[in-house]
Amino acid sequence: MNILLTNDDGIEAEGINTLAELLSKYHNVTMVAPENQRSASSHSITIYEPIIVKQVKKPYNVEAYSISGTPADCVRVALDKLVPDNIDMVISGINKGLNIGNDILYSGTVSAAIEGSMYKVPSMAVSAQFIKNKKENYKIAAKYALDMLNRLKKEDLKNDVVLNLNIPFCSEEEIKGIKVCKVGNKIFNTRFSEEIDEEGNKILKLEGDINEDIYDGTDVYYIRNKYVTLTPLHYDLTNFNILEETEQLFLS
């Protein structure tokens, strides 16, 4: 398969390079990723500035480019200019940290995959749980991504669907299996701490703690119970539950 590989942690991040090294043994890989760290970019794109594209050398068999823009920019530039007619699948990751629950709305990793689906290319986001002061399990995540890719080769995956794959932080032997599940609620209870600087300005810093109020059967629930989670996503944000009800407001 011809694969476009991107991320939001930057082209030198360990996660994307671990995945690129493994995938390039079995597939044709083109890496197009942000020049710098762009986590939590969501689906932002560059409008008022030029985008700089630089070719980058890698020690394994991939064609690689760094992009001065966002993760979504990377996919747009790749599919419009760099490899416009030759991509079977977009893979975004491996992200440093989970993209589950409400956090997917902020995620540059997930948004890059969604951008791929908007170009009618089947896409997948891959994320590995991050725990402070511990080594991320990128190699385990890469193996699961490759396995998922091999499974998808045999299926007629709809091109407007994004698969969101998340791997818990534990040994491979501790992983209980894979759960296909829905998106959960928030992972963290966040708040801003406040300080005042010498000029009287407020300095706000985002803080938070783990949200213990989680729902059974969701990605948040299964990750905490050491399952790999897989959730199909879609970029159509229409709330169909109240579409007809909303329409009635204008019929009276």
UniProtKB/Swiss-Prot annotation:
The keyword Zinc does not apply. A divalent metal cation binds at D8, D9, S39, N95. InterPro entries: SurE, SurE-like_Pase/nucleotidase, SurE-like_sf. Its EC number is 3.1.3.5. It catalyses: a ribonucleoside 5'-phosphate + H2O = a ribonucleoside + phosphate. Belongs to the SurE nucleotidase family. Nucleotidase that shows phosphatase activity on nucleoside 5'-monophosphates. GO terms for cellular component: cytoplasm. One of its GO terms (molecular function) is metal ion binding. It comes from Clostridium botulinum (strain 657 / Type Ba4). The keyword Chloroplast does not apply. Its cofactor is a divalent metal cation. It comes from the Bacteria. It is found in: Cytoplasm. This is 5'-nucleotidase SurE. Keywords: Cytoplasm, Hydrolase, Metal-binding, Nucleotide-binding.
